[in-house]
Amino acid sequence: RINVETGITITDGTINRSTPAKVVAGAYTNSFAGTTATTLYDLDANENVLAKQNPPNDGTLENVGPLGVTLNGQGAFDIAGGANGLVLAALRSGASGPFTLYTLSLTSGAATLYRNTTGDASLSLIGGASGPVVRDIAIRF
């Protein structure tokens, strides 16, 4: 790793998790000008959890909780506003096919189909069987 202010290289510490992490996406709370504090959250596809990276620059992951969905190694998410803002994720549970739009809880990790009161997952899909791979998602706040 490189310190962007000084240019000095830093050796990362030992990763200390029961299962090696497979971080497929990350998002910050309070990611806007003038903020005094921020928290980095990650999606770990090996454990299917929302994790907090604490401290952000050390790469230490603390599990927040299970997503309740299985990730196949692809996904994207963003947090609009502060810690109580909109947390939106596009996740793919199969090896191919469409992504599904979810909201995530920053306190429990639980994924809920986005604005879908019927429970019909097809109403929250992005793309079809050959739809595009979602690499990033951004919410304008």
What are the roles of these predicted feature ranges?
Residues 1, 37, 46-55, 95-103:
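Structural motif
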Residues 3, 27-30, 42-44:
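Short, structured patches in soluble enzyme cores that scaffold and shape functional sites
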Residues 78, 95, 100-117:
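A structural motif
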Residues 107-108, 120, 126-141:
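Non-transmembrane domains of secretory- and envelope-associated proteins
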Residues 2-19, 52-70, 111-129:
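Beta-propeller fold detector
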Residues 36-44, 84-93:
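Short beta-strand elements that form the blades of beta-propeller/WD-repeat-like
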Residues 19-37, 71-84, 133-141:
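Structural signature of eukaryotic scaffold interfaces centered on beta-propeller domains
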Residues 66-67, 91, 99:
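An amphipathic alpha-helical core segment
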